[in-house]
């Protein structure tokens, strides 16, 4: 599936499903047909939610806006189908935290949870997550 490219991202980004089951999907992130990263999804029918995991852009492609573009695309796509889109991020994953802050996410002042992770909610259409 193609990710529409804006003028500043002259190269073409796309997602290619690498594997899929009822509750999980793994996709390669492609730039002009070459793999530059990956992203995984876990689907929870009972609460109509999707969790994002294993989201990674290769080191040589970081800092160029590709992660932002992919994440915005995924959120826009899945908020049409799901009531909740979220992820957990390790407290020491500074690159991911920087990306999520760029998208307007605020991190809990009390710090991460007992697993040293932050819960990041990208979209919530009335799902009680408490």
Report each predicted region and the residues it spans.
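Acetyl-CoA-dependent GNAT
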Residues: 1-54, 58, 77
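Active-site beta-strand termini and strand-to-loop segments that position acidic
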Residues: 30-32, 122-125
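Residue-level detector of high-confidence beta-strand sites
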Residues: 38, 108-110
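A short, internal acetyl-CoA/4′-phosphopantetheine-binding micro-motif in the GNAT/acyltransferase core
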Residues: 55-62, 89-90
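Conserved acetyl-CoA pyrophosphate-binding loop and the N-cap/start of the following alpha-helix
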Residues: 61, 65-73
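Short hydrophobic clusters on alpha-helical segments that form packing/core surfaces
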Residues: 74-78, 96
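Conserved GNAT acetyl-CoA-binding A-motif
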Residues: 78-89
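Conserved beta-strand-loop-alpha-helix junction that forms the acyl-donor binding cleft
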Residues: 87-97, 101, 113-123
């Amino acid at each position: 599936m193609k990710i529409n490219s804006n003028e500043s991202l002259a190269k073409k980004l796309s997602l290619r499903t690498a594997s899929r089951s009822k509750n999980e999907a793994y996709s390669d992130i492609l730039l002009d047909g070459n793999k530059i990263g990956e992203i995984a999804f876990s689907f929870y029918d009972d609460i109509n939610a999707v969790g994002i995991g294993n989201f990674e852009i290769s080191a040589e492609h970081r800092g160029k806006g590709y992660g932002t573009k992919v994440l915005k695309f995924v959120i826009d796509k899945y908020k049409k189908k799901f009531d909740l889109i979220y992820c957990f991020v390790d407290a020491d994953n500074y690159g991911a935290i920087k990306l999520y802050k760029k998208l307007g996410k605020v991190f809990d002042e009390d710090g991460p949870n007992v697993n040293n992770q932050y819960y990041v909610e990208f979209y919530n259409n009335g799902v009680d997550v408490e």
